[in-house]
Amino acid sequence: MRTAGHSQEEVRLGGTLVSRWIALSLLLVASASGAEPGPIRLYDLTYTLDIDAARPDQVQMAWDHCHAVAALQGLVNRHEPVLYIRFAHSRYRNRNIDHFWLEKLSEPGGWLHGRPIRRIETLADLIAQFRSHIRGLVVYDPNVAATSNVASTVAGVEDLLPVRYDRSEGSLYRLLVEGERSLPVRRWLVGPDGASLFTGAGRIPGTDLPSTGSAKCDAYLWMKHNYLDAGRCDGAYGAYYLDQYWLKKPRNAALNHHCLTNHDFFVARKAFFFDLGVWADETPVDDPDQELGTDLETLKALLLSAYHHGGKENMIHIGGFVPWAHKYTTHGDAGGRHDPVPTEWEYGRVISAYNGFMDADAISYGAMANASFFMHFPMRPEYTQKWVTRQELAERGYLDADGQVRFDGREFLIFYVGDYDCAAWLYQRTMDIWDDPARGQVPMMWCISPVLDRRAPMAMDYMRRTATPNDYFASADNGAGYCEPGMLQEPRGVSGLPCGLDAWARHCKTFYDRWGLSVTGFIIYAHGPELNEAGLDCYASFSGNGIVPSGGPASLLHKGMPVLRFDHDVNEGDPADAARHVVQRIAQRRTEGHPPFHWFRNILKTPTWYVRTYDAIQQINPKIELLDAPTFFELYRIHLESQGPSSP
């Protein structure tokens, strides 16, 4: 079943032969039985990227193999880290991302140092190796695209492998259903003869529920009835990933952006999977004959059930993102009437109304493998950070004898170093952004959502262990997950549910305390309302040293928490252009009456870019001073205290 193969001796990780790793021994805490963990099983899935995307048979092979392997990995790694996949390749370094992380984790003193690695050569051998983890198969319908996501849900709950119905020669279906190593089919989402079960007519199969008129939505409501409503899924985990519609347009984004390899973590967590539009005023490109708004109403039904089965108490962690290059937007041939960014915002508004938040694996760097392996990484109980004292500020010349801010004509600047609101972007870009040799030369406020430690704990730990004194960490949008917090406030639009602020505060405080965070570097209001008094109180309970919302008052001190409204995005590639933008905007802000504290957002910029941009800023206006986050926000708080009454 493999289209490519290499001997063990031919596979290298950063110049280290895999055969050399086999001589290493593991430095992990022994299990309760005292036994050492077994070897890591390594499977190379990169052959699925080395295909001709114009050939349907090769595209189907890539989809089928990635889907089955990801689900298998989620099952195998549910309780311990055993199966590791080699898949994604860096666009900025000539390295495989998964090998990068395996190398890092295998360094002396590392989590995996000395643990033997055994390569598995073929998909058939991989399945045979882990046959004891698999109860059988769930077969889904190539003519009802939504059934591929339903199959991922079923796979996680019932310990099954998802297989697309395809009786053509050489298909995965032929191997696993009709071949010598066949497995029992435990769940059919299509007739054994290939006829569709979900037709958009009559009643939803196996239920008394009337059809929605959409086979797509009927499949999801069948899933809801049998898995979410029945409490068999964990409602605290959802997964918004592109369904098998990808097979029609594999080149609309990076070839790895089917994001099937992202499924493993959510399969392990028994999450519910979906791919639905969020607009009530248009029909989706993948289901144009449905009644207007059916996708949205189906999504709301899923979210409400999830809310009642874990989300109410724990929030709903939803991996993935709007598949804007393929569906639901104006981009290319995605067939929608709304632009991608408003569609993102509307999606955020809807899920937040049910206590949902995004772990937003967005296009460009959305593919991620091995999260079900990484989730077992042994984090420290806490990662502390020091906040600056007023005595230290005075000693550094920032405060006068009366304890007031000494501006001396200076303009204080801070950059929001983002966007790290999803595990996939952090996993992909650490090697070229964090490991940039210029890091440490200027202060940088790294804004990373702390909830990413569920899927990429090794990256967050690596950053903390290798941080310089100029690296400080704050939370990304909008806290411990990308949630529109105004939609947690009563009255709640869309859902009409009770206030969700207490659940959000408990959720965020757990992660902020673990990672030593006290600043939320950006809060996106988007299509939701601004924070009201209760919402500000919520953030003050876990982010007391500052927030930067996208709306509301330009400056505010709320119960001691400094609030600074966001300003421009500065994302010019040329540092000279970026510097001119910053300098001009600071001058404009001052004429508009803003205080000499300035925040600008940047997306996936390297430390080298920041060094060169700040050098160029200094050449234009040496009075502009880039500060570290504690200094910036503490000075801003002191300044606000001097301005008179604050929010009580």
Where are the predicted features?
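Catalytic grooves of carbohydrate-active enzymes
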Residues: 292-323, 413, 417-441, 451, ...
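Bacterial Sec-dependent signal peptides at the C-terminal "C-region" and cleavage site
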Residues: 29-37
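Substrate-binding cleft of extracellular glycoside hydrolase catalytic domains
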Residues: 449-510, 514-517
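Active-site beta->alpha N-cap acidic-glycine motif
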Residues: 371-464
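Bacterial N-terminal signal peptides
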Residues: 19-30
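N-terminal secretory signal peptides that target proteins for export/translocation
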Residues: 1-18
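Acidic-and-aromatic substrate-binding clefts and catalytic sites of carbohydrate-active enzymes
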Residues: 46-68, 83-97, 104, 111-112, ...
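Preference for solvent-exposed, low-hydrophobicity sequence contexts
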Residues: 36-381
